[in-house]
């Protein structure tokens, strides 16, 4: 639990939920339902002062839609992989979140994303803070799971972790002042498994000899997000 409040940030409430996941019996292919407790911390406007999330932080965003110039940032969720999810509600018109921005720009903190291109752009558009360094599980998936075109987070969790996450709240009103328990649980699930996925992808990227090219993609990702915002969202600037 968090003991201190940030100046300009307030704790709304902390709740413990149970994320239902599928895990195999040790004997083989039969699967059983396993409960994984997750504590959700909900804040207003920014992370609280003094909160430390460690050297590797999973991050995801919820917005009012998919157009960053039209649809505002509503929620940023984070986890350091310890079973805690930290959710920050962003108000309409808010243009600064100092503690969150410091985390995004901290060169000693690796930020984990799934489809980071969108999240990096959304937060840069809102606060002017460019996340780096980064790791994107969707890019990693496309580099090593070439046997499929299904690279969604739900697909990765099912195949690689034997976990089934719900996407029912993906399209909902994230700008509401009071989020439902279902929304908070959904938001938490989007960051709870990225650390495990990263570990597995690091092994696969090394196995397939694609770790170096993956790192180059991750290094370029913040610039790709800026290009999206600057007017080149669907254009390959490297094309003839």
Language-model segment annotations:
Residues 1-4, 17:
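Short, positively charged low-complexity motifs
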Residues 24-74, 78-240:
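DEDD superfamily 3′-5′ metal-dependent exonuclease/proofreading module
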Residues 7-10, 21, 26-27:
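Serine residues within intrinsically disordered or low-complexity segments
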